[in-house]
């Protein structure tokens, strides 16, 4: 295809995104991540960040990173399967196992890479994956990369999952049930107790992505700990990029499972090892989350979430089924959602409009994410702006 044709093709596709209101506008952040930040030149309250425990700019993480960089250098110099597996990475993987309360752990460059590599590694042709309707895109892509068949069950619908297991279990060798623990657009929690019972009854492997539960629920150990089913989950997936304030993905499981993943997950085998600085920061983040200070940060996080959720509800906003610091304000209209997000930013509140295809049409929303570092005046400022422009736009 000629260069001019390529340009015209994607220019046309871009125009279509603009016309449908689906173009993703990116704002420049000019300061460290925190409850407040400088975005596009103005100071704003940040309600669009995964930085739940306010650790992303913690000086202890920065010191750990600097010390590791001085000791090991910046880059690892090789893929980790060959010569990039530094001793500090082995230390991190022991910490992952401790954090996830499993026999062993493995680190991936991103959470996306953890799902995209691990899911295909676990299944073969002749296997079946049962996946929640609202699972994260990294799970969806991991399933697509596998050779297994897939069946989608209705969101958090245990009866539908049971029906699909009953009708299909005997047709396949292995069955893998995959679910988010905390769903990223609604902030609701998967019914893991019931799902775990079904996995046991039908001899299925249970894979739980706890990206938004790590460091948030279960005294920091995540959603399975919160619900008392840690030992019922076979594969524990998580991230460092949210509550832990750093970068990377992790899997915790039995030692044999982890070693098999290490030998079969292409996103691990074919990736360059992480900078030692990132690894050291991750170790420090786990230590903080598992300390008494971490528990205090989690308590403050949930107090802020409850305050803000009740505040939005009292104004007349629909917050859906949120049970976590992810608190949607569901608008149900693309144009109004974008207008509200723009108005809030002008008022000094940084939020992001979430519209189709990220969510279904008619459920467009602003996803608010509070963190442990927000002061009450930050949340009150945001609620005041929501009230002002919610009324002005006819949303409330």
Question: PLM features: residue spans?
Answer:
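PLP-dependent enzyme catalytic core of the Aspartate aminotransferase-like
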Residues: 59, 63-67, 71, 94, ...
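Conserved N-terminal alpha-helix of the aminotransferase class I/II PLP-enzyme fold
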Residues: 63-111
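Active-site PLP attachment segment
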Residues: 219, 225-260
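Active-site phosphate-binding strand-loop segment of PLP-dependent enzymes
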Residues: 151, 155-208
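Conserved PLP-binding catalytic core of the aspartate aminotransferase-like
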Residues: 297-306, 313-348, 358, 362-363, ...
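N-terminal "arm"/small-domain region of PLP-dependent enzymes with the aminotransferase-like
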Residues: 6-7, 11-72, 204
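Conserved PLP-anchoring active-site segment centered on the Schiff-base-forming lysine
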Residues: 118-137
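PLP-dependent aminotransferase class I/II
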Residues: 243-312, 317-320
């Amino acid at each position: 295809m000629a260069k001019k044709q390529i340009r015209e093709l994607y220019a046309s596709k871009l125009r279509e995104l603009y016309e449908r209101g689906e173009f993703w506008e990116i704002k420049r952040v000019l300061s460290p991540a925190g409850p407040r930040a400088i975005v596009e030149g103005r100071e704003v309250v940040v309600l669009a960040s995964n930085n739940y425990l306010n650790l992303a700019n913690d000086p202890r993480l920065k010191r750990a990173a600097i010390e590791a960089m001085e000791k090991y250098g910046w880059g690892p110099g090789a893929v980790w399967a060959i010569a990039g597996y530094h001793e500090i990475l082995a230390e991190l993987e022991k910490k992952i196992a401790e954090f996830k309360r499993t026999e062993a752990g493995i680190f991936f460059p991103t959470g996306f890479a953890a799902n995209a590599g691990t899911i295909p590694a676990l299944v073969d042709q002749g296997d079946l994956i049962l996946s929640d309707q609202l699972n994260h895109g990294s799970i969806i892509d991991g399933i697509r990369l596998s050779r297994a068949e897939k069946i989608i069950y209705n969101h958090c619908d245990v009866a539908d999952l049971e029906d699909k297991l009953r009708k299909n279990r005997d047709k396949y060798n292995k069955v893998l049930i995959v679910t988010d623990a905390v769903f990223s657009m609604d902030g609701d929690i998967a019914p893991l107790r019931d799902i775990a019972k079904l996995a046991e009854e039908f001899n299925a492997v249970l894979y739980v992505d706890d990206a938004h539960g790590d460091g948030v629920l279960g005294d920091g150990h995540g959603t399975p700990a919160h619900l008392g089913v840690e030992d019922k989950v076979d594969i524990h997936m998580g991230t460092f990029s949210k509550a832990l304030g750093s970068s990377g993905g992790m899997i915790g499981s039995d030692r044999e499972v982890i070693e098999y993943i290490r030998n079969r997950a292409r996103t691990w085998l074919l990736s360059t090892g992480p900078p030692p600085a990132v690894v050291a920061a991750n170790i420090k983040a786990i230590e903080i989350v598992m300390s008494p200070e971490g528990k205090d940060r989690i308590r403050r996080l949930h107090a802020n979430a409850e305050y803000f959720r009740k505040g939005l509800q009292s104004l007349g906003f629909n917050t859906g089924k949120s049970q976590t610091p992810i608190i949607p304000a569901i608008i149900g209209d693309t144009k109004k959602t974008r207008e509200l997000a723009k108005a809030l930013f002008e008022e000094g509140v940084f939020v992001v409009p979430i519209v189709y295809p990220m969510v279904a049409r008619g459920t467009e929303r602003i996803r608010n994410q509070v963190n442990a570092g927000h002061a009450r005046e930050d949340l009150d400022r945001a609620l005041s702006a929501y009230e002002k422009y919610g009324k002005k736009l006819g949303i409330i």
